Curated annotation (Swiss-Prot):
<dbReference type="GO" id="GO:0043190">
    <property type="term" value="C:ATP-binding cassette (ABC) transporter complex"/>
</dbReference>
<dbReference type="InterPro" id="IPR001367">
    <property type="entry name" value="Fe_dep_repressor"/>
</dbReference>
<dbReference type="InterPro" id="IPR001626">
    <property type="entry name" value="ABC_TroCD"/>
</dbReference>
<feature type="transmembrane region" description="Helical">
    <location>
        <begin position="233"/>
        <end position="253"/>
    </location>
</feature>
<dbReference type="InterPro" id="IPR022689">
    <property type="entry name" value="Iron_dep_repressor"/>
</dbReference>
<keyword id="KW-0997">Cell inner membrane</keyword>
<dbReference type="GO" id="GO:0046914">
    <property type="term" value="F:transition metal ion binding"/>
</dbReference>
<dbReference type="Pfam" id="PF00950">
    <property type="entry name" value="ABC-3"/>
</dbReference>
<keyword id="KW-1133">Transmembrane helix</keyword>
<feature type="transmembrane region" description="Helical">
    <location>
        <begin position="152"/>
        <end position="172"/>
    </location>
</feature>
<keyword id="KW-0812">Transmembrane</keyword>
<dbReference type="GO" id="GO:0055085">
    <property type="term" value="P:transmembrane transport"/>
</dbReference>
<dbReference type="Pfam" id="PF02742">
    <property type="entry name" value="Fe_dep_repr_C"/>
</dbReference>
<comment type="function">
    <text>Part of an ATP-driven transport system TC_0338/TC_0339/TC_0341/TC_0342 for a metal.</text>
</comment>
<feature type="transmembrane region" description="Helical">
    <location>
        <begin position="69"/>
        <end position="89"/>
    </location>
</feature>
<dbReference type="InterPro" id="IPR036388">
    <property type="entry name" value="WH-like_DNA-bd_sf"/>
</dbReference>
<feature type="transmembrane region" description="Helical">
    <location>
        <begin position="100"/>
        <end position="120"/>
    </location>
</feature>
């Protein structure tokens, strides 16, 4: 079935066009996402609607522009750029909030487009059927001319991002530094704006004005979950965009089926644009769940491992506190009646597995139903208690905390206090011997 589909030249042209357009939107969507302006694509896609309609009318009624694709693209880009300039004017000159300006331009330009559609519907019925594709997309009408145009725009976009990568990245992350270095950030901004408008206009027939903004957001958002490096995000985002476009095109053809409705055979065709956006949404969901850096499953496992490590350290501290009471060989009864056990674990039953794990790691030894710290376990427990009491001393002496309110803060910090921070605190506090509660601060071996 796959080979039969790809032998169809009509399908192949739309397949290539949609895939390339989605790759290009993902590239420029990454720039918008990093600039924290992802909604700009939504406003510009709606702002280009009246320009597309004016271009379609010119190509339909003016013999000079008869059936010209370029006049439609130019008019659409002009309307999109005008919309962006209006947004900037509202924000800078009229002090309008960014979101309010985006919404105002979106509905205003789209409203003008709807008025033009009503005119086209009455005066040019044939053209009306054609321009409906701008709203929801109609990938099947994309031929090799559109595919070649999409390839040209993708290659130009990739070249511009490669050539202007340093200027664009500096302008995004540190605009003031870019100004001080004499970089032409205004030129970079205009290039980004022109290409975003061009990509939107060339892509509305594949996904539609109402859905194309999703392809500016979803692939970059997926790539952002997998990397922190801008160049890697750009590459991954483009790949993800191409995959979503290819899957949407393929499944819209592969799952075309017939059904019987009221005794008549009807062909059910899954639209390409919504399918592309659907796969993009699925990709975002999968990356949010399974990303090895920030995915929900990764964070869940990391949190569970931290809690397990924290409980292990709490057990070592219980041994230490019992040693301060001259109980060196700890029985189960000593553990159960320990006040610290109730503080750390509450009413939970004592876990024999945790004790077994401490023995396995060589931190605790067990003999004759009694447990005691090994040298390794005692060193780790001393380090934890030292971190706790040092942090209490710092909060009281340097930040003027009440000594009765520092215990909970120290309980949180003791598990993440590094050796470097320990050394810094010791120097700052002049190597104290006692904490604010007059308890001895353990000394580290070798210091």
């Amino acid at each position: 079935m796959l080979s039969c589909i790809f032998k169809d030249t009509i399908f192949l042209s739309s397949f290539l066009a949609v895939s390339l357009i989605c790759m290009t939107t993902a590239l420029w969507g990454t720039i918008l996402l990093v600039e924290r302006r992802p909604l700009l694509s939504e406003s510009l896609s709606h702002a280009c609607y009246p320009g597309l309609l004016i271009g379609a009318l010119l190509s339909y009624k003016v013999p000079l522009f008869s059936d010209s694709l370029w006049i439609i693209i130019l008019c659409g880009c002009a309307a999109s750029i005008l919309g962006c300039l209006c947004i900037a004017f509202l924000e800078k000159k009229l002090a309008m909030h960014k979101d309010s300006a985006l919404c105002l331009i979106l509905v205003s330009f789209f409203g003008v487009g709807v008025i033009l559609v009503s005119y086209v519907k009455d005066s040019c019925p044939l053209l009306y059927n054609k321009i409906n594709a701008y709203l929801y997309g109609q990938a099947a009408t994309l031929g090799y001319a559109e595919a070649r145009l999409a390839l040209i725009i993708f290659c130009l976009s990739a070249f511009v991002l490669w050539w202007w990568y340093r200027q664009i990245s500096v302008a995004i992350f540190d605009r003031e530094f870019a100004y001080s270095c004499g970089l032409r950030t205004r030129t970079a901004e205009m290039i980004v704006l022109v290409f975003i408008s061009l990509v939107i206009v060339s892509g509305v027939r594949s996904v539609g004005i109402l859905l194309i903004s999703a392809m500016f957001v979803a692939p970059p958002l997926s790539a952002r979950q997998l990397s922190d490096k801008l160049s890697s995000i750009l590459i991954l985002s483009s790949i993800f965009g191409g995959i979503c476009g290819a899957l949407g095109c393929y499944f819209s053809v592969a799952f075309t089926c017939q059904s019987i409705i009221e005794g008549k055979a009807t062909v059910i065709v899954l639209p390409t644009g919504p399918l592309v956006v659907f796969f993009a949404g699925v990709l975002v969901f999968l990356c949010l769940i399974f990303s090895w850096k920030t995915g929900w499953i990764t964070r869940y496992i990391r949190r569970k491992l931290f809690l397990f490590s924290r409980d292990e350290e709490h057990l070592l501290k219980i041994f230490w506190y019992l040693q301060e009471q001259n109980i060196y060989r700890v029985s189960m009864w000593d553990f159960v009646r320990s006040r610290k056990l109730q503080e750390y674990f509450g009413s939970k039953a004592f876990s024999g597995f945790r004790m077994f794990w401490l023995c396995k790691k060589g931190l605790v030894s067990c003999f004759d139903h009694q447990x005691f710290l090994t040298d390794k376990g005692e060193a780790k427990a001393a380090k934890l208690v030292r971190a706790h009491r040092l942090w209490e001393s710092y909060l009281v002496s340097e930040l003027d905390f009440n000594k009765s309110k520092v215990h909970n803060f120290a309980e949180e910090m003791e598990h993440v206090l590094t050796d470097e921070l320990d050394t810094t605190l010791s120097k700052m506090l002049q190597n104290p011997d006692y904490d604010p509660h007059k308890r001895e601060i353990p000394k580290l071996k070798g210091k």
